[in-house]
């Protein structure tokens, strides 16, 4: 059947900023969809507010709108672009929910818009839990018992539920948001009351808990002809009760019998066909002793779709887009083999293991995992055996366990970690095996199948009884099991790099196999590779190519922005005539799409695996600038192992001088460049002494970290001692830096060739200095930076380029106070702000950087901003109920959104995505004088003002009337929490003293704002900016290129 000719201009809706439960996988699926539809001759328009994505690049879609993902924006785009079809299945829950709103609002009907792919009715049937329950019931499919708790009948409905524990779920939600397993009625009652207070939902869905059963997933794809295949099935090591996004997942399933496999496959196809799915979807089952229950269906591409695509090589999103265009599976060629069709189910002769990456190294919160997601990213390991795939996944995590799987806790604590779902459970089981714990008991407590624990025992036995100080004689056998050199090092006491060199000298090296969707039955056109210690090597000739290493798993401070840089660098190399190799371990990303680079090696991003690929491929150069801190920290080690210079761009010697804060600060001092007063501390006592010498407040900064890890503004001497102790656990020395109060921070990205440079743009933080650049609200636009400050910055950049011979991209962070410019830090790599400034200027800065690395010169481009571009961070606070909404020098955000405008007020207004008619003000004493003018502005714009008692009195003394609200402990009404819960307040301005009591007082206010999605402004400068933006501000939605033309 030919492609559909009843549609011509298609709007693809993206997923917006990265949040927990919705991350880089939707950049991957959305990019694939756009390219796939354009291949068919359709005019593709993209809407996505996330500038860090590849899909918002002009190479992906014909027209790109980096605008809020709202009904209002979509309607305006429909009018402007004459849209006749919308593809909402590639943008996660955000796009799917928006499609339903567009239908319910009548916009689809009014403009004659078609939803291509799975119909909206099918989406609603799968997403609405009540409708889905009735659908499964009519089909005779088994499902857990279902109950409902209504807003107005909480006590009655909770009392009527016969079986506890239960699982609480909400409809149309993301990453299990609002979900939880509840063990008793009292907790269920409390949870229901909290959820109803924090949202506008009318009822809660409550299901029988299936805790302990196996969780199995099938990735299914179906066309409009009724052809339906399962791309793969996936087995969760963690049992039911742990969200699949939180679980360790193996593909293909390892413990199912053929009868069980076929039973679930048949059920999946029946259900997907019954729903009328046209495209990709994911279905989840609970399984125990031949019995199964249907849990849910995701009627769209998902996190699991990206994982299945990378695990099998089957490009699910690309095929789903072709189906949306009208093709059948029997008509679509498999792009990996280029000879078979998409109707063939993939066949695997290897194993993949996915492990989530949690942010518990950033957040001191409860490490228990459950039905609501907490992980930020994930990694995947590929091997010929489960053991090999598991160990490669562990190596890819880039955390403490990547170099040592031992867990040093007492036995009773170890049993607790084995029995309770948490991020360390698999390492607790490893440790239990080292201590000869009973396998059956560990299986019973954890829910892990004995099969997996026995496989883990093989790893433990290979590591036992190594002689300290000696490389094991049976090294080849250990490597065949899949154990990385870093972990071998921990058990034999020989440095990992020494082991790697030893292997190279004795030719104990891996070969590389191809992922081909067909277990080698057909010729493969694409080199998608993984390593294993066997005999036959399938690596193509890649001599003279250039390798780019990715940034590994998404995590706070190192996420999608770096994948953007990696992909753009690959495309630049291709345009320049160079072949490229990509090495990465993240299954969510565009960079690990098999046809982005000339060869993809899906391997851990560690020195061992990078060196292995370099030696096997014969590549001529290595680019580490787009791998975040990961690449910076390993660059020198890679060159030392190889015994030669191979890193392109800034030299590893310069990188080391810049990354060591002590050395860097002294170099800057020698250059005569201003920096905040500082001292170098060698231990905890020295830290306290030098901090007191500088005078509080101060900031402690450690070396070789990203995202300001462990950094914090410290006002209190007792707290200083505690923080110093924690930092010296990860750092040999600490830079004690005076905190510059009332300064403005700026980010300066620039490209240089070692002598000349071009500044990409100067981005100004709206908040005062002290908020991490990854968390700050930032703006780029005309007239933002005074001319005299620009000239001083240019002078500093020139000095840096010449001193460190910077080649490629670099990022300089500065603070400006009283006309003076102070250097905070320099990063000799691409930064988080590079995608943002690239979209704001319309210039491919990554390409210019790669040209410099290859040997070209850079011309100084003086950028003249034409419009305003606002960068707003997105935080994960809603997922961590015990985490306060307070930010500072250590980064906490998961993603970002960009809001362009012809004026700054327009950009700010877009970022609110709601009208503001009432504001609650509650600020600390030192901010009260500054809040007066802000309150007056709000009042003049017709905004109703509320305030807490102290703030209300202060404003009244300055002639500004407010209505006073009270805390619960005040025992007076109206109460703050009630007013926020009732929807009477549209925005909250809250600053707090950084003392335990003050933070605790504001905690509930901040939490309920986060849960209800109410704008929470925690900085006076930012409050002023938003106050000035309110009122009659004209808002329009434009293609990103149009903002570059507006003067």
Swiss-Prot record:
Positions of the UniProt region annotated as Carbamoyl phosphate synthetic domain: 540-916
The residues the record assigns to binding Mn(2+) 3 are 813, 825
EC code: 6.3.4.16, 6.3.5.5
Q: What class of enzyme is it?
A: ligase
Amino acids binding Mg(2+) 3:
813, 825
Q: Which pathway does it operate in?
A: Amino-acid biosynthesis; L-arginine biosynthesis; carbamoyl phosphate from bicarbonate: step 1/1; Pyrimidine metabolism; UMP biosynthesis via de novo pathway; (S)-dihydroorotate from bicarbonate: step 1/3
Co-factor note (free text): Binds 4 Mg(2+) or Mn(2+) ions per subunit.
Which residues hold ATP 1? 129, 169, 175-176, 208, 210, 215, 241-243, 284, 296
Q: What chemistry does it catalyse, as a reaction equation?
A: hydrogencarbonate + L-glutamine + 2 ATP + H2O = carbamoyl phosphate + L-glutamate + 2 ADP + phosphate + 2 H(+)
Q: Which residues bind ATP 2?
A: 701, 738, 740, 745, 770-773, 813, 825
Region (Oligomerization domain) residue spans = 399-539
Provide the ATP-grasp domain boundaries.
133-325, 665-854
For this UniProt record, the keywords arranged alphabetically read as follows: Amino-acid biosynthesis, Arginine biosynthesis, ATP-binding, Ligase, Magnesium, Manganese, Metal-binding, Nucleotide-binding, Pyrimidine biosynthesis, Repeat
Per the record, what is one GO cellular component? cytoplasm
The residues the record assigns to binding Mg(2+) 1 are 284, 296
Residues that, per the record, bind Mg(2+) 2: 296, 298
Residues that coordinate or bind Mn(2+) 4: 825, 827
Names of the cofactor(s): Mg(2+); Mn(2+)
- What are the protein's GO molecular function terms? ATP binding; carbamoyl-phosphate synthase (ammonia) activity; carbamoyl-phosphate synthase (glutamine-hydrolyzing) activity; metal ion binding
Which amino acid positions bind Mn(2+) 1, per UniProt? 284, 296
Provide the function of this protein: Large subunit of the glutamine-dependent carbamoyl phosphate synthetase (CPSase). CPSase catalyzes the formation of carbamoyl phosphate from the ammonia moiety of glutamine, carbonate, and phosphate donated by ATP, constituting the first step of 2 biosynthetic pathways, one leading to arginine and/or urea and the other to pyrimidine nucleotides.
Q: PANTHER family given for it?
A: CARBAMOYL-PHOSPHATE SYNTHASE [AMMONIA], MITOCHONDRIAL, CARBAMOYLTRANSFERASE FAMILY MEMBER
| HAMAP family on file | CPSase_L_chain_A (MF_01210_A)
Which protein is depicted?
Carbamoyl phosphate synthase large chain
Species name: Thermoplasma acidophilum (strain ATCC 25905 / DSM 1728 / JCM 9062 / NBRC 15155 / AMRC-C165)
Q: What is the lineage of its organism?
A: Archaea, Methanobacteriati, Thermoplasmatota, Thermoplasmata, Thermoplasmatales
């Amino acid at each position: 059947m030919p492609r559909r000719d009843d549609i011509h201009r298609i709007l693809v809706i993206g997923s917006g900023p990265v949040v927990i439960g919705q991350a880089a996988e939707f950049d991957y699926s959305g990019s694939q969809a756009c390219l796939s539809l354009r291949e068919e001759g359709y005019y593709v328009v993209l809407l996505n507010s996330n500038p860090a994505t590849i899909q918002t690049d002009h190479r992906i879609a014909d027209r790109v709108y980096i605008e809020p993902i709202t009904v209002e924006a979509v309607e305006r785009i429909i009018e402007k672009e004459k849209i006749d079809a919308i593809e909402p299945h590639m943008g996660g829950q955000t796009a799917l929910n928006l499609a339903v709103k567009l239908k319910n609002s009548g916009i689809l009907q009014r403009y004659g818009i078609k939803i291509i792919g799975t119909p909206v009715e099918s989406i609603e049937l799968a997403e609405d839990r009540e409708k889905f329950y009735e659908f499964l019931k009519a089909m005779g499919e088994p499902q857990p018992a279902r109950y409902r708790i209504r807003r107005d009948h909480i006590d009655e409905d909770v009392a009527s539920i016969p079986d506890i524990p239960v699982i609480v779920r909400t409809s149309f939600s993301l990453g299990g948001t609002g979900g939880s397993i509840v063990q008793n009625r009292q907790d269920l009652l409390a949870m229901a009351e909290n959820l109803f207070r924090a949202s506008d939902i009318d009822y809660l869905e409550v299901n029988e808990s299936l805790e302990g059963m196996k969780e199995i997933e099938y990735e299914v794809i179906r066309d409009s002809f009724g052809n339906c295949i399962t791309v793969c099935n996936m087995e969760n090591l963690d049992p039911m009760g742990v969200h699949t996004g939180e679980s360790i997942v193996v593909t293909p399933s390892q413990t199912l019998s053929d009868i069980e496999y076929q039973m679930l496959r048949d059920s999946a196809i029946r259900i997907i066909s019954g729903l009328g799915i046209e495209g990709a979807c994911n279905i989840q089952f609970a399984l125990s002793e031949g019995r199964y229950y249907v849990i849910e269906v995701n009627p769209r591409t998902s996190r699991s779709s990206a994982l299945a695509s990378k695990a099998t090589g089957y490009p699910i999103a690309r095929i789903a887009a072709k189906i949306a265009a009208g093709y059948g599976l029997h008509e679509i060629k498999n792009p990996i083999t280029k000879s078979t069709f998409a109707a063939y189910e993939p066949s695997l002769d290897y194993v993949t293991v996915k492990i989530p990456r949690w942010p518990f190294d950033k957040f001191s919160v409860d490490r228990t995992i459950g039905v609501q997601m907490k992980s930020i990213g994930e990694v995947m390991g590929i091997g010929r055996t489960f053991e090999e795939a598991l160990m490669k996944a562990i190596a890819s995590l880039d955390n403490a366990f990547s170099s040592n799987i031992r867990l040093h806790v007492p036995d009773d604590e170890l049993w607790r970690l084995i029995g309770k779902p948490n991020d360390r459970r698999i390492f607790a089981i490893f440790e239990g095996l080292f201590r000869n714990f009973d396998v059956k008991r560990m299986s019973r407590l954890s829910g892990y199948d004995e099969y997996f624990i026995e496989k883990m025992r093989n790893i433990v036995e290979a590591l036992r009884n190594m002689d300290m100080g000696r490389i094991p004689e049976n090294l080849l056998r250990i490597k065949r099991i899949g154990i990385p050199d870093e972990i071998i090092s921990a058990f034999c006491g020989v440095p990992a790099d020494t082991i790697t060199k030893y292997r190279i000298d004795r030719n104990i090296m891996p070969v590389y196999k191809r992922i081909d969707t067909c277990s080698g039955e057909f010729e493969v056109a694409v080199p998608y590779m993984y390593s294993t210690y066997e005999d036959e090597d399938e690596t193509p000739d890649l001599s003279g190519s250039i390798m780019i290493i990715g940034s590994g798993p998404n995590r706070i401070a190192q996420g999608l922005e770096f994948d953007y840089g990696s992909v753009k660098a690959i495309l630049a190399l291709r345009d320049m005539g160079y072949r490229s190799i990509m090495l990465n371990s993240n299954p969510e990303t565009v960079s690990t799409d098999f046809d982005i680079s000339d060869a993809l090696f899906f391997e851990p991003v560690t020195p061992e695996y990078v060196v292995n690929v370099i030696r096997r491929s014969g590549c001529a150069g290595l680019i580490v600038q787009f791998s975040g801190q990961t690449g910076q920290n390993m660059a020198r080690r890679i060159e030392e192992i190889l015994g030669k210079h191979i890193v392109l761009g800034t030299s590893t010697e310069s990188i080391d001088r810049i990354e060591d804060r002590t050395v860097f600060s002294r170099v800057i001092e020698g250059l005569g460049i201003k920096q905040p007063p500082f001292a170098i501390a060698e231990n905890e006592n020295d830290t306290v002494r030098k901090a007191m010498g500088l005078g509080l407040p101060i900031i402690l900064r450690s070396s070789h970290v990203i995202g300001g890890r462990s950094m914090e503004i410290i006002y209190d001497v007792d707290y200083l001692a505690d923080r110093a102790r924690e930092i010296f656990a990860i750092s040999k020395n600490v830079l004690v830096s005076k905190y510059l109060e009332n300064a403005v921070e700026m980010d300066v990205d620039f490209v240089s060739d070692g002598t000349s440079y071009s500044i990409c743009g100067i981005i100004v933080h709206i908040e005062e200095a002290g908020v991490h650049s990854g968390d700050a609200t930032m703006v780029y636009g005309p007239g933002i930076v005074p001319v005299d400050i620009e000239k001083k910055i240019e002078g500093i950049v020139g000095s840096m380029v010449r001193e460190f011979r910077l080649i490629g991209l670099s990022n300089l962070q500065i603070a400006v106070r009283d006309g003076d410019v102070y250097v905070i830090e320099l990063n000799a790599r691409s930064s988080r702000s590079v995608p943002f400034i690239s979209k704001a200027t319309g210039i491919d800065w990554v390409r210019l950087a790669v040209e410099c690395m290859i040997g070209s010169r850079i011309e100084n481009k003086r950028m003249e901003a034409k419009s305003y571009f606002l960068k707003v961070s997105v935080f994960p606070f809603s997922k961590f109920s015990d985490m306060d909404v307070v930010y500072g020098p250590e980064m906490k955000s998961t993603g970002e959104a960009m809001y362009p405008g012809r004026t700054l007020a327009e950009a700010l207004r877009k970022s609110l995505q709601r009208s503001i008619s009432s504001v609650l003000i509650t600020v600390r004493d030192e901010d009260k004088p500054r809040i007066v003018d802000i309150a007056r502005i709000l009042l003049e714009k017709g905004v109703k003002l509320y305030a807490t008692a102290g703030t209300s009195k202060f404003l009244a003394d300055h002639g500004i009337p407010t209505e006073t609200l009270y805390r619960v402990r005040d025992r007076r009404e109206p109460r703050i929490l009630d007013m926020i819960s009732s929807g009477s307040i549209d925005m909250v301005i809250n600053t707090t003293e950084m003392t335990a009591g003050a933070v605790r007082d504001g905690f509930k206010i901040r939490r309920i704002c986060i849960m209800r999605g109410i704008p929470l402004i925690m900085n006076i400068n930012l409050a002023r900016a938003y106050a000035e933006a309110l009122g009659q501000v004209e808002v329009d939605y434009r293609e990103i290129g149009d903002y570059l033309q507006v003067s």
